[in-house]
């Protein structure tokens, strides 16, 4: 899974881009605490990182 696919899923679930710091896009959700930092652009994220990001977002 690449970062573009992760970002698409986050945005569909209501996560909003808060800021960009270097090569990381930081997303926050209006109803959920915390934030999620996605390395972008990155062609392939490791399976563990992709699953961790989706779990943090409540999508898995």
Question: How should each PLM-predicted stretch be described?
Answer:
Residues 4, 8, 12-13, 26-60:
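C-terminal structural segments of small proteins and small subunits
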Residues 14-19:
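Short secondary-structure junctions
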């Amino acid at each position: 899974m690449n970062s573009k696919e992760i970002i698409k899923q986050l945005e569909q679930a209501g996560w909003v881009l808060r800021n960009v710091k270097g090569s990381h896009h930081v997303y926050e959700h209006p109803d959920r605490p915390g934030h999620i930092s996605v390395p972008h652009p990155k062609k392939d994220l490791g399976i563990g990182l992709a699953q961790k990001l989706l779990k943090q977002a409540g999508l898995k």
